[in-house]
Each structure stands twice: as structure tokens, then as C-alpha cells.
Amino acid sequence: MAQADRTASEKLGIPAAVLMERAAMAVRDEVYAILGTGRPAAAADSLTAGETCAAGAGAESGRTGDCRENTGTGSGRAFRAAFVCGKGNNGADGACAARLLLEDSTAGGCGHRQVLVRVFTMAPPKEGTPLRAQLHTLHAYGCREEPFSQEALDAFAPDLIVDALFGTGLSRDLEGDALSAVQGMNRVREQGGAAVLAVDIPSGVSSSDGRILGECVRADETVTFAFYKRGHFLYPGCRACGKVVCRPIGITKKALQAKPEMFTYLPQEDPPERILPERDPAGNKGTNGKVLVIAGSLNVAGACVMAAGAAYRTGAGMVKVLTVRENREILQETLPEALLDTYSGSSAQSAREALQKNLGWAGYALAGPGLSKSEAAKEIVTELLLEAPSKLKGLVLDADAIRLIAENDLYALLRACAESIPVILTPHMAECAALLRIETGELKEDPATWLKNFAKLHHCTILCKDARSTVVSYDERKVYLNTSGTNALSKAGSGDVLAGMVTALLAQGMRAFDAAAAGAYLHGLAGVKAAGLSGDARSVMARDLLRVLEGLPEEFAARS
């Protein structure tokens, strides 16, 4: 965020003071909205998450100075807003917002009840800093800041606490006075019933990866500026953000070009359903995509049903399943719409011959769900990577196919294949870590960077499944962070459904990155819908996703 501020100031000519004023106006408006004083907040994108008198309209006008004895107007007790300001720009934003509340009192205000303002700081600000300048202006309105203390905050009994302690630049664990301030704000929220509004991101939450840096403020709402940050959506920090509101302050995408990773592609900014392919009214089963699903093994027939069924439900015109002979009867009974071919799971030669026969039929293939890591499965994956460039238009690799690539060092074949046709990998975190040959914990620290480097090296697209799935591609600067979904999707077979969906979207002509992003988004929506119909996320099964997929892609295509 600091880099974006500098770029906006240096390259676009927007003074830093103007950006701060606009940010403070956004904070001020959210204060009014939360306290219900009647001032409508300006247009904003949103997701779900010294004491001086600022009087609203209808109040006695113009009073500033010490208001500790003021009990408000005839409409009731005055609201109390405590601003806890750190020494950096985040604290200056908070102090500036407090000053705007005081200006409203002088001008007659816009609310219906007074807002009593008290500003707490952590240390005397240094000369020449934005915070020092904002506090100096506050003094002109009769407002004097005071050092933060738990006793003073408790005694003030605020209705609202504005957390302006730390912004997006925090990267170390909280300690000392800062930790005490965070604990104090949480205490007043929990025991005193105060609402908490965080400025940019709750203090103690890493804006880059959502980590909790020791401890964090538990906000009811977060107002951020210009663009969302990854920490607003990544666990565990996203749970501390409450409702997240994004307000424009003049930092444009042009100002962000110096820092490409800020182009995090979120549904709230550009819904992926907008890029779903149009259905040709004169099309036929052949023109809507022919998908070969290579899945299943002995006693693992469900993966075939989930993946192939999802491909059909997401719009594929024809689907054929290639699996072991033991699964034939189950497939014919549960998914009669699918074409079917089988091979001997104990014979690598049988598997290779069946694959070669069927690759010529399909335009696109999905390999991996429930495939196992047998010699026959290894032969299929190896042969598939060799033959796909000349036989297919696109390939999706999931589950055991990814494990086989990692365990048998098939990276060179993967890259050669991906240089010829679009290849999408859909691993979960553990499979992805195995593919990258790192520990899962290391991957979780910075998934976007790890995934981006691998995608560039191997010329592919990766959809890494997690509570917040991430999509990257070698040819796409954006990183898509999916925010749809529910823990109802934490069930066996859910990933097979997703893989089938992504393959179907690819087969209908979508770019690999777009197919992966839209697939992840729709899959999450399907989980939410299934959980809503069942009434309990615990009871949702993968087959329920197939039921709710009916109409879902078309419903969102119509909204684009």
C-alpha cells in the first residue's frame, strides 16, 4: 500500500495529503454508518466483514473543546468514538478522520446525535511526520490526544473503537505497548460491547498472507482503500476483519503497475462468471466439448462418477470415462449418459493400449481422480504426457496424476506437453507441496510466489485448492484468490467434482486461467448452495454438488 501511495504521488501527481484526506473521509463515513447517525456512506464495494464533541444535524451547533460532561442532545446520549492511533500513516489516517468528525460539528454536522471523540496515541509523534501534522490540526479544534491506557479506554466507555494502530506494512509479531493496546481494544469490545472499525486491516493481521502476528484486533468492520488485500481473505486473519468495505481514494491500477502482485484477482472486483462461454444456440454435443475422464481404480469408482458427472453438469457435450474393468457396472448404473471404456488395472500394457485408443476420440482430457499410483496408472500418466500434444487440445491433471509426476520425476514431460497445449493442474495443498518438493507449511507462507514460479517454469496453470484456493498461470499476471465456498466442501469427492468442472469449461473454449478461476468460483457457490439446501454443512456429500450444479453455470452466465 505504501508503494502504491508513493507511485500515485510521484507518477500521477496526487499529493499524499490528498490521499490521506480521502482515506480519512472513508473512515469518517463508516463511523457514521456504524453508529447509525443517519449519514449515508458513499458508494463502496463490500463483502460480507483528547475527547471532543462532533455534533450531528439537529444537535446544538458549533460546540468544540472538552466535552467530557456533554450528554448529547435531546435525541439521547452522545455516541462515543475512540481512535487508537499508531505512529505511522495508518495512525495519521485515524487522526485525520477524527478531525473530520470535529469539522462536522463546526459545520452543523450530518447525523442526528453527537459523536464524542477521543484520540489515543502510543508515543509522542516525531516532528515532520503525517501523524504530527494531523494532531497539530486537531489541536486547533480543541482536541488533545492522550497516551493510550486501558484505564482511560475503559473509563471513556466507547460505542465505537477505530483501530488505526497498524496498517498493511506490519510484518513482525506484536509486543510491548502495541500488544497491550490490541488486547485492550479487544477487551472493551468483548466486555463493554463496543463495535470495532479497523482502518485498512485489523492491527496484527498480515496484509500479505493473513497470518496473525502474535495477536490481532477483532474487528466488526474493516474499511480498506483502493483495493482489497490478501489478508482480508486468507485464513486465519480474514476471520478478524468482519465486514470488509473497499473505498476508492484515487489510487488507480496505473499507480499499481510498479507492484504487479497487487493485481490480486478477486470475485468482488471482476466476477469470473462474466467470462463463461456463451452457449451456441445452434451447437451440438460435439461442438460443446468432448471430454475424456481417466479416473478410478479398484474399489474407487466414485471418483469417476463425480468427475464425469460434474463435466456434464458444467456444459460438456460428451463425456467418456476410461477406468479399470471392475468399475464398469457401477458406471453404467450411476452415470448412463457417459461413454465408457476399461482396461486391466494390473496390466500397464492394457492401460497404455486403452489410452491410445481413446485419446483420438477426445478433444480434452482429465486424468488423476482416484487413479491410484499403480504401474498401470504410472503408464497412463507417462503416455498421456507424451501423446497429448498431438492428440488433445487441452489437459487437466488432478490428484494421483500429480503425485505420479512428482514421485517419478516426470517434470520434463509435463513442461514439453504444456508448451504445446494448455495444461491445468488442480492439486490440494499437500499434493502441491509434493509437486514443488517443499513442506506444506513453507508453501502456505507464500503460495502465490511458489505457484507462480512453478507455473512459469513448467508453462502451466495451477489451481491450488485450499480454504482460499489460488489460481496462477504462466501467461497471466493476475493471481486469482477465490473467496467463494464453505467448509461443506471438505469432503472426499469434492475435488473430483471441481476437476470435472474445470475440464468442461476448458473444453468449451475458455482460457486455462479463466477456466480454473471460474471453476473454483462456481464450485464454491455450489458448496454454499448445497449446504443451504441441507441445512447443515456437515451433511453435504460430493454427490450433492452434482445436484446443485444443475442450472448454476447458466444462471451465472446470464448475469454476465
Task: Describe the predicted segments one by one.
Residues A133-L138:
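Conserved nucleotide-cofactor-binding alpha/beta core module
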Residues P158-L160, L165-E261:
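Internal gly/pro-rich beta-alpha loop/helix module
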